[in-house]
């Protein structure tokens, strides 16, 4: 006998486009509600590539006054091979949100 239960997990991150392309613009949105950076006044996107083998950049995020969500837009470096790896931090309080030490990843668009 199985019980039917539905669970709604909070979605902290959205990547646009879903498969970012090298040399093109990418926007990462972060919803801090319910997470460790919920009370942060400043959030930075910590961005690397391919398992964080290399740190690409730290990108200051802007907070949308209406939704309260954070947003950062950047150009995907041509040197990115397989995926972007990223997490978020509050530089003023030294607090990180790294998805339980798993970070987040976005697959880079394939070039055919």
Predicted regions and their residues:
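Glycan-association/targeting regions that enable binding to alpha-glucans and other polysaccharides
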Residues: 1-112
């Amino acid at each position: 006998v199985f019980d039917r239960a539905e669970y709604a997990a909070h979605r902290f991150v959205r990547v646009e486009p879903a498969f970012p392309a090298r040399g093109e613009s990418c926007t990462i949105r972060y919803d801090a509600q319910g997470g460790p950076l919920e009370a942060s006044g400043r959030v930075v996107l910590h961005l690397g590539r391919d398992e964080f083998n290399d740190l690409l950049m730290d990108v200051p995020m802007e907070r949308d006054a209406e939704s309260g969500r954070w947003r950062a837009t950047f150009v995907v470096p041509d040197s990115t091979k397989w995926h972007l790896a990223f997490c978020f931090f509050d530089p003023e309080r030294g607090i990180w949100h790294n998805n339980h030490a798993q970070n987040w990843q976005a697959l880079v668009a394939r070039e055919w």
